[in-house]
Regions:
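Conserved AMP-binding/adenylation subdomain of ANL enzymes
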Residues: 190-226, 230-272, 287
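Gly/Ser/Thr-rich phosphate-binding loop
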Residues: 173, 243-244, 270-275, 285-351, ...
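AMP-binding/adenylate-forming catalytic domain of the ANL superfamily
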Residues: 132, 497-521
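Conserved AMP-binding/adenylate-forming core of the ANL superfamily
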Residues: 2, 22-65, 69-73, 90-95
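Conserved pre-ATP/AMP-binding loop-to-beta segment of ANL
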Residues: 152-170, 176-177, 182, 213-222
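Structural core segment of the AMP-binding/adenylate-forming
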Residues: 49-50, 80-150
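AMP-binding/adenylate-forming catalytic core of the ANL superfamily
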Residues: 89, 95-96, 106-108, 332, ...
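Conserved beta-loop-beta connector loops within the AMP-binding
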Residues: 362-384, 419-422, 484-488, 522-523
Length: 541
């Protein structure tokens, strides 16, 4: 069976796409395919000439922009292993991730030059620091991205590649520190549909030549990944545009702006958008509802989401403004693709948190018994087929998440479900206390540790409270030291100096006693109920 490699796919796409087709759009700047091909080939060759070797890790530390897409493509072509970096991290989090990943190359935006300057000496194994100019004052003793992309003939590298080449997706770990999920190119391509999309009836391609022939006759997509490309959902949305010979549109705003998104859809005739549930969809619906005149979003045919709840009411709101939309709600994670899906159109409504079980999925109890449809039992959903190799440098976590059951290797990321009589899944949530806020994984232990470093805090517990916008809102309940004064905003500001801003609790609630069990264990259920009741009372609900 032929092995797939993203660098080979891009070389093949480069060879057939009309050179004047637009490949990347960011603000007013458009890069056409002939220039995308030339620049990514130049960049790939320059990184290898600079000392990188196949298998080395290349980390990307920037917001969504065209250079991010170019850098990903160049890394694929040079056989370098992609590493995503959360641009919200503070310095010790960055050092941990880049050191854990064994990053040899870091491509970063100039806005982050001060952070890079602060950590460089602690990362002696990074051989190339490549800076993308973005209007901010850059750093010293760095390599200019643009000089690498523009220097050279732009010819293909002409190197052999392998389906075993890797892509790392760093995701939250059980202690709050990120872990690198290792995907082989061949497995990731097959796991994402092998150039097709079975959820809307597009079959996979059997090999590269058949895939290329299909691209010659299919209309090219215009994709708009709205989540950060530093996460899997946004990243795969951008990669899909490039590997399909289409156009990837990215927005300039530092945070999600629904009006900018709608303007981009209208202006660039976007055909597919990627979101993360209600955190993106609700602002889009609200912007559409208030707009006068209404933006023209008739070109948009598919909106895909993964990672957080996407409610039926919000889906209906989108369909009210464009009845031709297909809304694909994917049940997946960095460790497990294709756990389930839910497709909604104007003719087919679906319930919230209900998914069709993927064809390679089963549901198991904690003692590894298979849960049968309609049994009323709950279990953890598992998927076989194309899977990650495991977690980088973490054999114990790999063995736990990717067990072999009855001779079959599965990925079981920890999502609890109930299998209904009709075979559909009702999503119950993570068995752990992981908080999912707008697609970001936040583990309570890390936030609790930051809170407990505050002089006024004797103890702290952190939970996720249901939130219409964020999916879950991070809420802390703190037990104060005797005679300590409570200042919620000051405490938030303190925590923000120790962990990334998105992990800082939206609310901090004081209590006299957290009532831990004698063995020190926390009653998270009680804390969550207390937080929900308190917040309801404060809102007057």
């Amino acid at each position: 069976m032929a092995q797939w490699n993203y660098g080979d796919i891009l070389d093949a796409v480069d060879a057939i796409v009309p050179g004047d087709r637009v490949a990347l759009i960011h603000g007013e700047r458009a890069i056409r395919w002939r220039d995308f091909t030339r620049r990514t080939n130049n960049l790939a060759r320059a990184l290898l000439d600079g000392g990188a070797t196949p298998g080395d890790k290349i980390a990307f530390f920037m917001r969504n922009r065209s250079e991010y897409s170019e850098g990903i493509a160049a890394g694929f072509k040079a056989r370098l292993t992609h590493v995503n970096v959360n641009y919200r991290y503070v310095d010790h989090e960055l050092v941990y991730l880049l050191d854990n990943a064994d990053a040899a190359v870091v491509v970063y935006a100039a806005e982050f030059a001060p952070m890079v300057a602060a950590i460089r000496e602690r990362l002696p194994n990074v051989a190339q620091w490549v800076e993308v100019a973005d209007g901010h004052r850059g750093g010293d003793d760095v390599i200019a991205y643009e000089s690498l992309a523009e220097r050279g003939s732009g010819a293909p590298l002409g190197i052999g590649r392998s389906g075993d080449d890797m892509l790392f997706l760093y995701t939250g770990g059980t202690t709050g520190m990120p872990k690198g999920v290792m995907w082989r190119h061949d497995d990731l391509w097959r796991g994402t549909g092998a150039g097709g999309n079975p959820r809307i009836g597009v079959p996979p391609s059997p090999d590269l030549s058949a895939y290329v022939e299909r691209l010659k006759v299919e209309p090219p997509p215009v994709n708009l990944p709205l989540p950060p490309m530093m996460h899997g959902t946004g990243l795969l949305g951008a990669v899909a545009a490039m590997t399909h010979g289409g156009t990837c549109v990215t927005l300039k705003a530092r945070s999600f702006d629904p009006d900018e998104a709608l303007a981009a859809i209208e202006r660039h005739r976007v055909t597919a958008a990627t979101i993360v549930g209600d955190a993106f969809a609700r602002p889009l619906v609200e912007a559409l509802d208030r707009a006068n005149p209404k933006p023209d979003i008739a070109s948009l045919r598919v909106i895909s989401s993964s990672g957080v709840m996407w409610t039926r009411e919000i889906k209906a709101g989108l369909l009210r403004h464009n009845s031709e939309l297909t809304l694909i709600d994917g049940f997946a994670s960095s460790e497990a693709l294709g756990l389930g899906s839910s497709v909604m159109t104007r003719d087919k409504a679906v319930d919230v948190a209900k998914f069709t079980l993927g064809p390679t999925c089963k549901v198991f109890t904690e003692d590894r018994r298979e849960v049968k449809a309609g049994s009323g039992e709950s279990g953890m959903v598992a998927v076989c087929g194309p899977l990650p190799v495991g977690y980088y440098k973490d054999a114990a976590k790999t063995a736990k998440t990717f067990p072999v059951i009855d001779g079959v290797r599965y990925s079981i990321p920890g999502d609890w479900v109930r299998v209904e009589a009709d075979g559909t899944l009702t999503l119950l949530g993570r068995g752990s206390n992981c908080i999912n806020t707008a697609g970001e994984k936040v583990y309570p232990e890390e936030v609790e540790e930051a809170l407990k470093a505050h002089v006024a805090v004797a103890d702290a517990l952190v939970v996720g409270v249901a939130d219409a916008k964020w999916g879950q809102s991070i809420t802390a309940v703190v037990q104060l030291e005797p005679r300590a004064e409570f200042d919620e905003q000051e405490m938030k500001d303190f925590v923000k100096t120790r962990i990334a801003a998105y992990k800082v609790p939206k609310r901090i609630l004081p209590v006299a006693d957290l009532k831990r069990a004698p063995n020190g264990k926390a009653d998270y259920k009680h804390v969550r109920e207390y937080a929900e009741a308190t917040l309801r009372g404060q809102s007057g609900a």
